[in-house]
Structure formats: C-alpha cells, structure tokens
C-alpha cells in the first residue's frame, strides 16, 4: 500500500504541493500590513524561489522603499538571481541594496563580483577600491586589484616594447623616452600590483600571488638596470 501511495505521489507535479508566487506575495502583503516583518521576509524569499520575476515586480510596485523591509527584500532578490546565474539582475539588486547601505563591505564585494561576471571590469576595479578604502585587509579585493594592475601593466609594457622594436635605428632621445615610459609604468602600475599582492600574502599564503611578485621583481630589475 505504501509503495502505491509513493507512486501516486510521484505522478503529481510539485507545484500542486507548493504555493504559487502570487499566493505567497499576497501573504507577504498581509504580513507587512500586520507588522510581521520577519514572516514577510521569509515569505518573500519563498516567492523569489517560486518566481523571481514576479517577486521583482512586487518589489518595484508594492514595496515602500522607506521601510526597513525594503533592503531585506532587495537582498533576497539579489541572492536569488545570483543563485540562478542571472548576474545582470543580481547586479541590479546589489546596486539597489547599496542605496540603503553604501558602506557595507559585504554588499560592495558582492556588487564587484557581479560586475566582473557582467564584464564590467573597470567598474569592478572602482568598487574593489571602495572596499579596500573601508577594509584594507579584504583578501578578495586585494587579490583582484593586485591581479588587475599586474595584467594591465603587462599589456602596457608589451606595447611599449613592441613600439620601441619598430624603430630600426632609435636615437638617444627615443631610447631615453622608452626607458622613461617603462619607469613611469612601473611606478603607476606594477608598484600598485606589488602593494596589493604583498597585502594578500599577509592574509593568505597564496602561491599565485608569490609567483606574480617574483615576476614584478624581475620587471623592476629590468627597468632599473
């Protein structure tokens, strides 16, 4: 008998045993009206799982943004869209959450992660710089910025060297300019990468950071010879 009950149960779609997003969102509205904020947030989390886009519409049209529950709802939407890999939407709601908590390091880091996922690398750099301004020991930010400045510097150095090699018979002035460009690049790029990666090593024994620092040391020797 139990086996037949299990077979019959498996034949019904799960939606028959779960609440739809619109039902959950009506309950969210009722919970908010009665002051049950914790329950409202819990219901909203369930509604995100049931239908994230319907929950999003509820947030934009029904939620009072001046209430304390608004940032909690924004967080639920951000985390839901991140979980389902809709990084554009997740980024939108982490940015929304920053409107409520602009100096929250965890939110800034999540926002930067989504910027990287969305291909907004320059924006991620700016966001991670905000992070280290608030928390100089943030491992993720230091690691990203160290790698960012190193890779950018490598690209710039290759261009400087390629341009110089195009000169069949460089003059003293052209050679001096070439050396000066390398020196300026080291000061503006490689040195920043080194500072961030050295900070990484004080926080975590990263072999990759150590290898990159060795490469920077070789570049410095070449620049200063």
Question: What kind of feature is each model-predicted range?
Answer:
Residues 52, 68, 102, 136-137, ...:
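Short coil turns that delineate tetratricopeptide repeat
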Residues 56-58, 73, 107, 141, ...:
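TPR alpha-solenoid repeat register
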Residues 47, 96-97, 130-131, 200:
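Canonical positions in the second alpha-helix
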Residues 17-61, 65-72:
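N-terminal leader/linker segments that initiate helical-solenoid repeat arrays
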